[in-house]
Amino acid sequence: MARIAVDAMGGDLAPRAPIAGALQALGALPPQHHIEFVGQTSVIEAELDALLRDEFASLARVRDRISIVEAPEIIAMTDKPSVALRGKTNSSMVIGIKRVADGHAHGFVSAGNTGAQMAASLVHLKLHAGLTRPAIGTLFPTAGDPILVLDSGANMDCSPEELVQFARIGTVYARALLGRDNPAVGLLSVGEEA
């Protein structure tokens, strides 16, 4: 069973987009999977009820696999990460990440403020032993199998050691989640301009 916490308040099109996307994912997943929407309960309930009544009525069967975790604060896309972490400790993003740290959820998804999510993850989830910096992973679709790109522009000043760490992270991901026995590793650099 997988329990995924979803930041229902994060992103430009929240709460509708994260709730609609999670409903579609839950409808396609086996019945042992569960979604926790994290955010303002009354807003989530209203949006969830509207979607299940109209556009996603065919997914009403998944309602019993959904729970809501109250989080009264929202980290805006314009908030500075450090200010958001200190001033919005009851935000949907921070509470969702803490759900993973405390073992209540297996994963966390947010379309919200990327810098705040990285900072909150560093504070509450920590780094795996041997890593000095996290990397954002993005799956790029291709005509064949998707390509995993790590550190999708998040860090402009990576050391050679950090690039090796990213390659190791990507290799583990490609083996474990993409089923690749011998994943290839490449380097794409933006370089530095004068």
Located regions from the model:
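Contiguous, glycine/small-aliphatic-enriched amphipathic segments in soluble metabolic enzymes
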Residues: 1-123, 172-194
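Unusually extended, aromatic-enriched hydrophobic runs near protein termini
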Residues: 3, 8, 36, 42-43, ...
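Ligand-binding beta-strand-loop-alpha-helix segment within the catalytic cores
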Residues: 95, 142-189
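Short, well-structured alpha-helical patches and their helix-loop capping segments
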Residues: 88, 100-101, 128-131, 155-166, ...
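Short, acidic/small-residue loops that bind anionic groups at enzyme active sites
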Residues: 107, 118-153
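Amphipathic, alpha-helical segments enriched in basic
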Residues: 1, 19, 71, 75, ...
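Short, charged/polar low-complexity linear motifs in solvent-exposed/disordered segments
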Residues: 33-35, 136, 166-167
